[in-house]
Amino acid sequence: MVNIRPDEISSIIRQQIEKYDQDVEVANIGTVLQVGDGIARVYGLDEVMAGELLEFEDKTIGVALNLESDNVGVVLMGDGRDILEGSSVKGTGKIAQIPVGDAFLGRVVDPLARPIDNKGEPASNGTRLIESMAPGIIGRQSVCEPMQTGITAIDSMIPIGRGQRELIIGDRQTGKTAVALDTIINQKGQDVVCVYVAIGQKASSVAQVVSSLQEKGALDYTIIVTANADSPATLQYIAPYTGAALAEYFMYKGKATLVIYDDLTKQAQAYRQMSLLLRRPPGREAYPGDVFYLHSRLLERAAKLNSDLGGGSMTALPIIETQAGDVSAYIPTNVISITDGQIFLSGDLFNSGIRPAINVGISVSRVGSAAQIKAMKQVAGKLKLELAQFAELEAFSQFASDLDKATQNQLARGQRLREILKQAQNSPIPVEEQTAIIYTGINGYLDDIAVNKVPDFIIKLREDLKNSKPEFGESIRSSKKLDTASEELLKKAIEDVKQGFVKA
């Protein structure tokens, strides 16, 4: 018979008790009540946070937006075709965040920062919340550096500064995206990181943007975030916040950044769709009550940081599409009141051949000359007034037959000024050449040149300054002002070029 040794048995039991280790994982689980139209109603999930990411059985991710007494309204970030009634939903305990890093430059990503350009996964330096807090009042400084767009009409009359929010507004097909892309192309060599956010656009349009940026060598410092027209409304809604989060990563490293939201009308429509499906009460134009907050919390993230925070900046160029030039609709008025000015593009001007079709009368920059170099302030001070007076006279002169000499001269000057502000797409002009062009027009040097010859004259003048008098450009780039020596050089260049152009 075997001897039973109680001490041995008790030591074995003690060892097993010590080794016993049970990991208890507490999960927040709910059940799908109904699903459809990109919305799921979920029962349970008592511990869920507003905006928390939820994972469904088929690995679809959703965001908890409506926290009601008996269920949770969830918007889906996928089509959710495999989600069934009664299937389980798990809370992740995380708020939406994306990977960020320098490797995202030159890449095309979706609103969750997943690459869609078949170039592999970009290396990330960490993550950022998609919806992070905007910098506070103390962390900011006033806008003081220019963000040159390369478009003469904008840089002279509606200047944009680093850290400003300038709305680009107009009907469809008036060149809104062209203005934004020209601005990106003009940042080449300026050490500015650009983010282009395409919301609800055709995939072919986005492909065109990518190829034109690539052609101009601008893709190397640009990140493209796209939620195409066939993407779920949730992705179209979060795309601008993703773009802002990517730009913030660079801004807090002390860099200047430029973000283009193309366009926020489609984001508002996606948000309206989600809100109505979640049965939130509709307001004006069926938009939910918090549609103002939708855009204000996005655009407030644009800032010029003070030197303690590294002095970085985020400049925002939101785009809004109007219907038949109606700027008094709900979304346009909201965004106009949030931004620091607007550039209004007119369909009538566009169709009459004035491109970029900027309506100078109702376009404004609330930062003003603080965002201009001194040379531009010196020459462009009177330009807006001259053009406004010309527009008034032109309308009046259609009814009057005999005009006095002074009026005729003013009309002739106005026609030439309008001509010098015309510009081809994807061909930004450096600020020193813009200064020369405006100086020539505003001081009457073009008055004796035929209107149809003005564009050729400007091309020749730019060539002459670049090739024969490079010190003019160097002087303005270094001193930022038009001194007497530079002015004499410019006058000499105008005289030299004018010899082949004077009206017969």
From Swiss-Prot:
Gene3D superfamilies: 2.40.30.20, ATP synthase alpha/beta chain, C-terminal domain, P-loop containing nucleotide triphosphate hydrolases. Keywords: ATP synthesis, ATP-binding, CF(1), Chloroplast, Hydrogen ion transport, Ion transport, Membrane, Nucleotide-binding, Plastid, Thylakoid, Translocase, Transport. Its EC number is 7.1.2.2. It catalyses: ATP + H2O + 4 H(+)(in) = ADP + phosphate + 5 H(+)(out). The keyword Chloroplast applies. GO terms for cellular component: chloroplast thylakoid membrane; proton-transporting ATP synthase complex. ATP binds at residues 170-177. The record marks 363 as: Required for activity. F-type ATPases have 2 components, CF(1) - the catalytic core - and CF(0) - the membrane proton channel. CF(1) has five subunits: alpha(3), beta(3), gamma(1), delta(1), epsilon(1). CF(0) has four main subunits: a, b, b' and c. PANTHER family: ATP SYNTHASE SUBUNIT ALPHA, MITOCHONDRIAL. Produces ATP from ADP in the presence of a proton gradient across the membrane. The alpha chain is a regulatory subunit. Belongs to the ATPase alpha/beta chains family. This is ATP synthase subunit alpha, chloroplastic.
